[in-house]
Curated annotation (Swiss-Prot):
Role this protein plays: Cell wall formation. Catalyzes the addition of glutamate to the nucleotide precursor UDP-N-acetylmuramoyl-L-alanine (UMA).
Pathway where this protein functions: Cell wall biogenesis; peptidoglycan biosynthesis
NCBIfam families: murD (TIGR01087)
Catalytic activity: UDP-N-acetyl-alpha-D-muramoyl-L-alanine + D-glutamate + ATP = UDP-N-acetyl-alpha-D-muramoyl-L-alanyl-D-glutamate + ADP + phosphate + H(+)
Gene Ontology terms: biological process: cell division; cell wall organization; peptidoglycan biosynthetic process; regulation of cell shape
Residues reported in the UniProt entry to bind ATP: G129, T130, N131, G132, K133, T134, T135
Keyword presence, Nucleotide-binding: yes
Protein name as annotated: UDP-N-acetylmuramoylalanine--D-glutamate ligase
Species annotation: Burkholderia multivorans (strain ATCC 17616 / 249)
Similarity remark: Belongs to the MurCDEF family.
An example molecular function term from Gene Ontology annotations: ATP binding
Pfam families associated with the record: Mur_ligase_C, Mur_ligase_M, MurD-like_N
Amino acid sequence: MFGDRQRPMVLVLGLGESGLAIARWCARHGCRLRIADTREAPPNLAALRAEGIDAEFVGGPFGPALLDGGVEIVGLSPGLSPLEPALATLLAAANERGVAVWGELEFFAQALRALGTSGYQPKVLAITGTNGKTTTTSLTGLLCQRAGKKVAVAGNISPAMLDRLAAAIDDTALPDVWVLELSSFQLETARTFAPDAAAILNITQDHLDWHGSFDAYAAAKGRIFGATTTRVLNRDDPVVMKFAPAAGAADAPRTITFGLNEPTQDGDYGLSRDNGIAWLVEAIDRDAPDETAPTTRRRKRDAHTPDIAHKRLMPADALRIRGLHNAANALAAFALARAIDLPAAPLLHALREYRGEAHRVEVIATIDDVDYVDDSKGTNVGATVAALDGLAQKTVLIAGGDGKGQDFAPLVAPVARWCRAVMLIGRDAPAIRDTLAETGVPLVEHPTLEAAVHAAAALAEPGDAVLLSPACASLDMFRNYAHRADVFRAAVDELAIDKGATP
């Protein structure tokens, strides 16, 4: 379970969800445990004690002394930035002493490898990206389930991977397929993780305060791929496409692309428009030796100039999730499921069934022919750009919060195109206002989200949307993005009552 180490001493840094899961997993396998957190009494400490986990707890600043006493592995929680000075010093000391630094994902990968010696060989699908991870992960899990597989969905989406694995072992119900949502934080410490297929949905600015630079952030996303992992890549995103192997490279991993245009390579996915109808399609090489075989067996890129036809899968309008960005997410999920040779028919039925996730471009009410849309999970600029372009209607946008050091310039074009006005809230409202001034769109700052909702409602016209897509984190005003969504929904409910409507 721990490479070539037998019951090692493990130092767990950070007692959040992943840190607690690492502690549980290590205790389960007889490891000696030391747990450290910068907080003297982190919320999960009570759970640790209640579960009877035998561990030394150290609260307060991190330092190299935490490695004393024979620590062999450091288990690093994903919320802790390795650039933070005290943690950076500790990790440098660990490196000097030959102490391994693993995150939960690496513990999980090592556990699957150990279970493999007993014959357990599940398929593993992984999803990352700045935006769309949770939707695509949930949808991929549903697709695999509808194809008759026993599925476990875990990771950044919750539950923690190690908790889900422990429960499956205890229930003697190990899944056929693991579908994992993975953040850049989780991937930063990946070493041996090698899923069967993995998707990068998009890469735009986010978490620059944690990674230090955009290049470092993008590189962390790329750690989702093992040497033989089938790569599912968004061809509309040039940063993502940097992870495509060079054409004709020896031993190159299989690559499948998806996008919102027509695919031009055998086995790729995209959209094709005919008589005003957008179709989800798969590119089929008419000259392939067996067009009925799964893509993974008939793909032969660069073998010749392909004669491509587009096989219609379903109308994009048949998806219950709104927006072109969600059509892209659906294509990515379908590509992942097909990459492990699941049959197409049940996958297409599942695509029509999926209703989406809360707080992700979710229409929560229509009042006086104005849609009120909750995209509180839109915590970065890329998410808000996708929401505006995906809705593709006149919108009064509510944005603002903690910008995390982002550049707001990518908002200029979609705001100029789609927004009737922008209501601004939170710490970085002035920075967003300054960036968007060139659009000529009315920009109004408000002290509260409730005030912004009522002002937006007064400006919206029939056929418009009032969209909460903050492009920012929430912690400057709210407990989390879900709390922000709750406040938005309550304000919309109040508005509906005032207007005598049913939200």
